[in-house]
Amino acid sequence: MKIFSISKDDWSNGLAQLEKSYRLFGPVKEEEFHNFKELAKGKSPDLGYLNSRLSPKAIIYPQSEAMFEYSLDESEEDHHIMKEVDKDYSARAVIGIRPCDAKAFVLVNHNFDTPEYKDPYWIRACEATTLVGLACDAPCSSCFCTTAGCGPYHEEGLDVLLVDAADHYLAKILTEKGQKLVNAAGWDTAVDAAAAARQIETGRQEAEAKITAF
């Protein structure tokens, strides 16, 4: 397990490096609410949000998408032949996803990536996506993640877990994809793993203690 410290002063510089090799998505405020959108060049995700109005699911599994196309123009050689639509499966990173939303992807995966059935659209999108989670230190009053096999610091489904630590983030690397992203961003300030793990565990316990709705 590796844990890095990311100074908030260096945060935007790292995102600028990531823009060179990833499409970046994150929470963006729209009027009164936040939703996950592809970030404009040079724009940082708003990590001060509580929860997004809609799930970030559409980044991997859009509500509707074109899968095939064909032409009825008989002057074209391949008219009336159905063809798969070209899709952009270039590397993308979702910055600031909540652990509960990442866990939801794990649950959906049970339907779309099984020995009996493998959905090619889902699998390609998942393979292209790196999920950088943001630990939830101030759960909403309606949150019930701890009763659903999840939690505000849950790691399953994530590639990196970010923990807000005042003037910096602690970035816990969970997968090879997560390590690749951190390397690409140039975030290379390692910390004492044992001490950082204790700090993260304390934050987890304090956050879970705030979930009292259920």
Model features per residue range: what roles?
Residues 1-214:
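Iron-sulfur-associated redox domains of electron-transfer enzymes in respiratory
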